Amino acid sequence: MRVAIIGMGTAGVSVLRELVKHPKFNQLDIDLYDDKVNMGQGVPFQNDSSELLINMPSKKMSLNLDDETEFWKWYKQQTDFNFDEPAYLPRFVFGHYMKSYLSMFTKKYPNISTNYNKVQEIYTNSNIDETNLTYYICTTNSGQSWQAYDYVFLTCGTFAYHDPYNLKGKKGYIATPYPTYNTLDEVNELDDIAIIGTGLASLDVVRYVAAHHPKLPITMTSRSAHLPSVRGTMIDVTFKYLTKDKLNDIKKHHFGNAPLDTLVSLFLKECAEYDIDFKKLVHRRTGNHIADLKYDLARPTEMGIFQSMIEHLKENLNWIWNSLSIEDQHQFNQKYSKMIQLNSNPMPPRTAELIIELIENKSLILKKDLEDVKHDGKLYYFSYKNQESVDIYNVVINATGAKSHLNELDQDDQLIKNLENRQIVQAHPMGGIQIIPEANQVISPRFGTLTNMIAIGQMTNGVNKLRNGVKMIVEQVAHTVSQLYDALESNEQQQRSDNQ
């Protein structure tokens, strides 16, 4: 069986790790596709400044669901990197951990090949009425260079960043913040810099720019200007009310769906079990960034339990989210998505302490109520609600986060646009592409369920709601890779039957 893995970041490497475990792995011919920069590391963990920290404790990050300390053990055994404060390691170190496994596998198994070209096209040229599809992968726009595959994993990573003010291509606009050590390449020492976005990506930019750009302060701005929370001391959590059995029982009485209000009530009962006042903590922010960060820093136990509850909710959100009606999914997005995002994926305490220091010494300005950004060919003009004058900058760094809907994509995500145009994938109303929940099999508007095409990661965000962390991606992989070997066994049985 010929297998293609398209994208070799967290999801792609995890797929390969699962595949090699099977006794029939040697019956596969596997081609890995990515460029030389991202092969084995992916964009989030690419080589970058050591100031960019993983937002999870090093001892809690792993591609191994059975050993959450695997990354930490790898770090302690290797000799290339050594850091004074390894509790939160630089992000690129995790990339090298992933890449070490890819290197080991490609050396050990002769049936793995690497292709350092970006995939431009995926198509199927099946006969009419034929449902057993072969997929053709091209690394050129002309379609002259292609390879045929029986099974495809779409592990392409996140979509490109939003461009909310249509600034892409303008001088002084940096459309993506990564790698951060390139953000200042074309910036003059006296340039005033603004960062659009106040999430984790913007904090990465601040860490780097504040350390390397002489003209301060930097301005970080968005509509709300909410910062992520600060990571506390995480604990293991088990739900006793919001469970699959309970949800299945609820669905029996509500036409196959579970009412959102009922599920929220069950989650609040879970919080009460751990003595967490969920509503108080959700609304704890005062708008004073220093006070809010210090609040979190002073309560590592309470914040850690609170964050652990949200993290456990996210880990189980696939079956919760997909039990909701469309109407309730819209309600969830309006009322709870932002709330969860603000309180999950917290920043390391070290980052919070740096942000406080930068604000206090006037090296960083945080502003809310951003309404518009204009460019006159030379400068950028930021307008704010309830502010008559505009703020003027030479350079704008975009840290708004990745797009989520297919209708937002442009040439930066041309492969996905081509797949949609050829009716191999279709848009999910809540974001990303349509897949079968749990199985992650792509649903095509032309061919129906593509049992031999698996999509994993942010491109499935309409089904795998808010489940784009490393552990959640690895869990998706673990649930789906066995399907390939089921298909291989089915093919072998069919061949035996045909030969009789």
Can you annotate each of these PLM segments?
Residues 1-37, 43, 81-488, 498-500:
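Flavin (primarily FAD) cofactor-binding/catalytic cores of flavoenzymes
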